[in-house]
């Protein structure tokens, strides 16, 4: 057995499909006191004359006359915006989430020996640790409305309703849960955790509809995802293009998924930075930082290879991280020289 372990190599082709399969999130407007009448939020176009506020060259800032001439230039912009109507004070965001099992079976693997060894490790984790820890964190990120992103900031009230198809629903006050630390699930949160856990374990079908209600105030701006448009012709002169689905303002499925998997507080600087999205190198692009550096042997690939190839079992917290990365999905094969 030991000899087999030493000859085992990482598969050159290895991929996992994501096990938290969420949809885009659509955005609607209504009123907190009357939550049975919702209208789709449309993207509007706005043309504005902005000010010159970017950092200027020293040659301009050191010469008052040149600076005055520069700031007098018109900074004309055409942008997309989205907002609640003045007759509505509440934003409703809706998406669906399908939780898939069969994690031990990669979608692609070109090395049968490696696939068997990796499958044994995943099965062993499921038997010894179970998916309860990960499921509880995914559930809490639904309950706290983390997926609302900027739409959550400054809200008067947040209500999240989760419905499991054909069964029951759970209701949460988003402000009861922290974004910085995770709690011990109880009540409805424990029930939602159990439903997600069964989905990850492959014991039951798990399809959820998530509806979040955010009281912001009449006419307040809301924040769909922003599109990355590389073709200048497609931009049509706009400096900001917002995402929409069938003329309804929306948030990208990738952004929703990023929020749901923001459960990693097992990395070295977690006390300072808080939970981050599960990523192979702990990358947070908004901060320009990778929190799981290979030199510290805390990145996904080092932990996975040591676990599968060398038989070095990580600490339980890092086991959760490795399994969560596989749940995230991706292409993890060893790159050729």
From Swiss-Prot:
Keywords in alphabetical order: Antiviral defense
InterPro entries: CRISPR-assoc_prot_Csy3
Transmembrane segments: none
CDD domains referenced in this protein's UniProt entry, alphabetically: Csy3_I-F
Biotechnology (record note): If the spacer DNA has a perfect match in the chromosome then toxicity results. Suppression of the toxic effects occurs via mutations in the CRISPR/Cas machinery, or via target deletion, which might contribute to genome plasticity. This CRISPR/Cas system can be used to remove genomic islands, and possibly other genomic regions.
Coiled-coil portions: none
Induction: Expressed in late exponential phase (other phases not tested); part of a large cas-CRISPR3 polycistronic operon.
A Gene Ontology BP annotation from the UniProt entry: defense response to virus
Keyword check for Cell membrane: no
NCBIfam families: cas_Csy3 (TIGR02566)
Subunit structure, interactors included: Probable multimer. Part of the probable Csy ribonucleoprotein complex with cys1, cys2, csy3, cas6f and crRNA.
Similarity comment text for this entry: Belongs to the CRISPR-associated Csy3 family.
Role summary: CRISPR (clustered regularly interspaced short palindromic repeat) is an adaptive immune system that provides protection against mobile genetic elements (viruses, transposable elements and conjugative plasmids). CRISPR clusters contain sequences complementary to antecedent mobile elements and target invading nucleic acids. CRISPR clusters are transcribed and processed into CRISPR RNA (crRNA).
Name of the protein in question: CRISPR-associated protein Csy3
Native species: Pectobacterium atrosepticum (strain SCRI 1043 / ATCC BAA-672)
Lineage of the organism: Bacteria, Pseudomonadati, Pseudomonadota, Gammaproteobacteria, Enterobacterales
Encoding gene per record: csy3
């Amino acid at each position: 057995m030991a000899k087999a372990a030493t000859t085992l190599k990482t598969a050159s082709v290895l991929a996992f499909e994501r096990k938290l399969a969420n949809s885009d999130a659509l955005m609607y407007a209504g009123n907190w006191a009357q939550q049975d009448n919702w209208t789709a939020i449309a993207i509007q176009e706005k043309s504005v004359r902005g000010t010159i506020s970017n950092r200027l060259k020293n040659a301009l800032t050191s010469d008052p006359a040149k600076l005055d001439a520069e700031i007098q230039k018109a900074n004309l912009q055409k942008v997309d915006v989205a907002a609640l109507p003045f007759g509505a004070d509440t934003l409703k965001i809706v998406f669906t989430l399908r939780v898939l099992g069969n994690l031990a079976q990669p979608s692609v693997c070109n090395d049968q020996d490696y696939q068997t060894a990796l499958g044994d490790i995943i099965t062993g984790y499921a038997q010894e640790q179970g998916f309860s820890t990960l499921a509880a964190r995914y559930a809490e990120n639904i309950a706290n409305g983390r997926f609302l992103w900027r739409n959550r900031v400054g809200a008067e009230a947040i209500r999240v309703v989760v419905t499991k198809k054909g069964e029951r629903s759970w209701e949460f006050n988003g402000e009861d849960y922290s974004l910085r630390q995770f709690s011990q699930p109880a009540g409805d949160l424990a029930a939602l955790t159990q439903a997600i856990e069964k989905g990850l374990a492959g014991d039951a079908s798990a399809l959820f509809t998530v509806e979040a209600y955010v009281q912001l105030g009449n006419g307040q701006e809301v924040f769909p995802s922003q599109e990355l448009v590389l073709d200048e012709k497609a931009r049509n002169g706009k400096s900001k293009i917002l995402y929409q689905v069938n003329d309804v303002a929306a948030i990208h499925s990738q952004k929703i998924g990023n929020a749901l998997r923001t459960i990693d507080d097992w990395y070295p600087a977690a006390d300072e930075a808080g939970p981050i999205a599960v990523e192979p190198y702990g990358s947070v692009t908004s901060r320009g930082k990778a929190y799981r550096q290979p030199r510290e042997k805390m990145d996904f690939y080092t932990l996975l290879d040591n676990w599968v190839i060398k038989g070095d079992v990580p600490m339980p917290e890092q086991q959760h991280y490795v399994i969560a990365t596989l749940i995230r999905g991706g292409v993890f094969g060893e790159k050729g020289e």
